[in-house]
Amino acid sequence: MAKEIKFSEDARAAMLRGVDQLANTVKTTLGPKGRNVVLDKSYGSPEITNDGVTIAKSIDLEDHYENMGAKLVAEVASKTNDIAGDGTTTATVLAQSIIREGMKNVTAGANPVGIRTGIEKATKAAVDELHKISHKVNGKKEIAQVASVSSSNTEVGSLIADAMEKVGHDGVITIEESKGIDTELSVVEGMQFDRGYLSQYMVTDNDKMEADLDDPYILITDKKISNIQDILPLLQEIVQQGKALLIIADDVAGEALPTLVLNKIRGTFNVVAVKAPGFGDRRKAQLEDIATLTGGTVISSDLGLDLKDTKLEQLGRAGKVTVTKDNTTIVDGAGSKDAIAERVNIIKKQIDDTTSDFDREKLQERLAKLAGGVAVVKVGAATETELKERKYRIEDALNATRAAVEEGYVAGGGTALVDVLPAVAALKEEGDVQTGINIVLRALEEPVRQIAENAGKEGSVIVEQLKKEKQGVGYNAATDEWEDMAKSGIIDPTKVTRSALQNAASVAALMLTTEAVVADKPDPNANNNAAAGANPAAGMGGMM
């Protein structure tokens, strides 16, 4: 297809229009008084959300050049979500400010490379200062506060704190949809290991790119499966029962993998294959753990067992299995409590006996997975639309809480970004590099400005007042009061704030140094073809 190219000012102006359209949509959701956005769906009812990354990903603009600008900012939100799990709206607001102010200066004749250098230096200074003013999370109360701010709901905050208390900071917490209207927390025996599906065609949820198996059989083996004939009799029995199957093996390759994928796509049966976790002797031990949890048997040559002779009774069972590209979570395994308790005692004895710190750490990981269980948050709501919106909020809250446990927390509501202004302002450079620093100084004020404007206040007035307050004191948009943010429970994970700034600065700096944009040339016949398709009688020359 022929290409169309725009250069310098034309290219940047078109991309900026796209940036503004996306960012102006997303930033209306920022803060406790942020609004919702309604997303049209090709099927089902419209979706109502205030989740920044969900909104950003759903926006496609008709103009190719504008769409490129929008997609680059959507990438900022997506990357921040991947790293920290929250802060996507803040990242979008920061990116828009840096891009907009940067393009003004580039248009006025500034050197974009110098501006980029200034942006990078200012961002590093801001991130270093964020780490200095960060506080460690101590106890259930602070965990609940982080989750409450992220979800704008104190009940959700308490729920996440309870879940973390029950399974530990590193424990597995999953979020499911409930059939009722109440949101509940339960802890079930379960395990998670760091192996994902071998083919993305095995997923059952294309939005989340994960596979959910209800009440599946689980084949556990340390062998490599390359010939489908080895497990064909077993597969036929499972298909007859209408059950799903999880295969945990050394590898699934050769003709076996495409055959399984083909049967999954055709709807013959639901199957997911993953590689066994660990390596060497540690892999064998982990497979035994999984077998104990699910009430199955490891099909291994060491035990004189062959795949061809495997019976249904030797397979494990579980209430639910969720597989993503990176992890497999087994919930409600069918193993007996006595067998699990015995296995736990064996691992505890091994921990006491070992002299290796590395081995002790790995054994403790196995113990946590086997004995800790999985916390399941069942999200309830009156309608499907409300259910989806509430689920997004709880997922954000969980991600924010984990980020806070990892790197600590700072004052929320955009206060921390204003608190680091003096450290950034202390940088003194020449010319366009200083211009880049000034651009970041302005951008750091933008989240507070937007939160205030969403609450019906004059953003500039709030920002100027905030600069006069002592560190940690900020504007609480929910109560319209000036408060010590940490004492009021308005705190953000340091990792979320840091990631939002770093990702925004990175993409903004790249956009400012863009000199040409290449896009597909619009097809002049496309509209004519569409019109003809919409009117079957078109071109039939009066044959009536």
From Swiss-Prot:
Signal peptide: none annotated. Residues 524-538 have a biased composition (Low complexity). GO terms for biological process: protein refolding. Its EC number is 5.6.1.7. It is found in: Cytoplasm. ATP binds at residues 29-32, 86-90, 413, 476-478, 492. Gene3D superfamilies: GroEL (3.50.7.10), GroEL-like equatorial domain (1.10.560.10), TCP-1-like chaperonin intermediate domain (3.30.260.10). GO terms for cellular component: cytoplasm. It catalyses: ATP + H2O + a folded polypeptide = ADP + phosphate + an unfolded polypeptide. The keyword Cytoplasm applies. CDD domains: GroEL. One of its GO terms (molecular function) is ATP binding. Keywords: ATP-binding, Chaperone, Cytoplasm, Isomerase, Nucleotide-binding. Pfam families: Cpn60_TCP1. Residues 522-544 are annotated as: Disordered. It comes from the Bacteria. InterPro entries: Chaperonin_Cpn60_CS, Cpn60/GroEL, Cpn60/GroEL/TCP-1, GroEL-like_apical_dom_sf, GROEL-like_equatorial_sf, TCP-1-like_intermed_sf. NCBIfam families: GroEL (TIGR02348), PRK00013.1 (NF000592), PRK12849.1 (NF009487), PRK12850.1 (NF009488), PRK12851.1 (NF009489). Forms a cylinder of 14 subunits composed of two heptameric rings stacked back-to-back. Interacts with the co-chaperonin GroES. Together with its co-chaperonin GroES, plays an essential role in assisting protein folding. The GroEL-GroES system forms a nano-cage that allows encapsulation of the non-native substrate proteins and provides a physical environment optimized to promote and accelerate protein folding. Belongs to the chaperonin (HSP60) family. This is Chaperonin GroEL. It comes from Lacticaseibacillus paracasei (strain ATCC 334 / BCRC 17002 / CCUG 31169 / CIP 107868 / KCTC 3260 / NRRL B-441). The lineage of its organism: Bacteria, Bacillati, Bacillota, Bacilli, Lactobacillales.
